[in-house]
Swiss-Prot record:
Bias type Basic and acidic residues, positions: 80-137, 145-160, 233-246, 309-358
Nucleus is among the record's keywords: yes
Family the UniProt entry places it in: Belongs to the SPP2 family.
Name of this chain's protein: Pre-mRNA-splicing factor spp2
GO CC terms: spliceosomal complex
Keyword field: mRNA processing, mRNA splicing, Nucleus, Spliceosome
Residue spans of biased composition, Polar residues class: 174-185
Region annotated Disordered, chain positions: 1-250, 298-358
GO-annotated biological processes: mRNA processing; RNA splicing
Source organism, top-level taxon: Eukaryota
Lineage: Eukaryota, Fungi, Dikarya, Ascomycota, Pezizomycotina
Length: 358
């Protein structure tokens, strides 16, 4: 045997099913869904082999059998999906740990703040001296001073400090002692009797009433009656006024009477304008005297009727616009006729105006 015969040979048999059984191979199984079918590579390989077979067999195509010798791991979809899943799980766990750490940091910071606040509050309470401590300290000082002055031993009961009441927050009311209450009660029960010579001082209200009700000695008897009736000792001081009260007030010099009730002495001060005459009936302040007959119902009427005009006998009604224009036109015509300036054109204009007025 030669060396070439001793070497193993790898042969791939291509042919129909009628070929020899020694070169028969198993039909390759159909690839699963996890394996990708490389169409380009197989098509190129198939085209090259078909060209060779055509050359050998004279252009006749026959079926072929392909033996698979190895399987590549780079195109495995299962492994890619597993990698993706593991990466997703890893990312989720990382995010979950990050959120947990963030929440834990927040809770830790909150607890730390609460502890610091409690510590500060406790320190403030311990450093702030209470009112009871100040009161007890002042009592001790007073007892020590009195002991040094007297140099006398005191009973242990007296030396004991009184029990301090618990602190009360908010509004505190100090109850008065019973001795002061009884003394004030006796003081109120036994008022000082005023002497006949001394008069009690008048209050502000009494002074105001006396100034309001003080009238001149020259006042009328009605004023004195009103003064007596409106004195502070009268019982009907708060009643409503009657017709008799209104009649008692004088109509003339009403303002002066009112001012006198408010304490005016009746003397005029400054520059005073004297009123020499009274106003006419139903005439306002500052109205002038009417020269003609005065009748309020005779407005817009002539003097020949019921009056209402001036002394010359002219109508006092307000002039209407039409009457004013008519009078002006008449005056204009008279002036034109007088100066001889009338013409045919002016006559036509007058006719048009007359037709328009109608």
């Amino acid at each position: 045997m030669t060396d070439q015969d001793s070497k193993p040979r790898v042969t791939i048999a291509l042919g129909t099913s009628s070929s020899s059984s020694s070169f028969k191979t198993k039909k390759p199984s159909r690839p699963t869904h996890t394996r990708r079918h490389h169409a380009r590579a197989s098509s190129n390989h198939y085209s090259s082999e078909s060209e060779d077979d055509d050359d050998e067999t004279g252009g006749q195509r026959t079926g072929r059998v392909q033996a698979i010798t190895e399987i590549s791991t780079y195109g495995d979809d299962n492994e890619l999906e597993n990698r993706d899943r593991s990466d997703r799980r890893r990312d989720r766990s990382r995010d979950r740990d990050r959120d947990r750490n963030r929440d834990g940091d927040r809770n830790r910071d909150r607890r730390r703040d609460n502890r610091s606040q409690d510590r500060d509050r406790h320190n403030n309470r311990s450093s702030r001296p209470s009112r009871d401590d100040d009161a007890s300290r002042s009592r001790r000082r007073s007892t020590s001073r009195s002991r040094d002055r007297d140099h006398k031993p005191k009973d242990p009961k007296d030396l004991q400090e009184p029990e301090t009441a618990p602190p009360k927050w908010g509004l505190t009311i100090n109850p008065k002692s019973t001795t002061t209450a009884t003394s004030s009660f006796h003081h109120q029960r036994q008022p000082r009797s005023p002497s006949p010579e001394e008069k009690p001082p008048q209050t502000l209200e009494e002074q105001a009433l006396s100034s309001l009700l003080s009238l001149d000695n020259k006042g009328s008897s009605t004023a004195s009656k009103r003064k007596r009736s409106h004195s502070p000792s009268s019982h009907d001081r708060d009643r409503s006024p009657d017709h008799s009260d209104y009649r008692a007030v004088p109509i003339d010099d009403f303002g002066a009477t009112l001012l006198k009730q408010f304490g005016w002495d009746g003397k005029m001060r400054g520059k005073v304008k004297e009123v020499t005459h009274k106003h006419a009936n139903l005439a306002g302040l500052g109205a002038k005297d009417a020269k003609g007959a005065e009748e309020l119902d005779a407005w817009n009427q002539k003097i020949s009727g019921r009056g209402g005009g001036d002394s010359r006998g002219r109508d006092s009604r307000p002039v209407r616009l039409e009457d004013y224009r008519r009078e002006e036109n008449k005056k204009k015509q008279r002036m034109e006729y007088r100066h001889g300036e009338s013409s045919y054109k002016q006559e036509r204009e007058r006719e048009r105006e007359r037709r328009g007025d109608r």
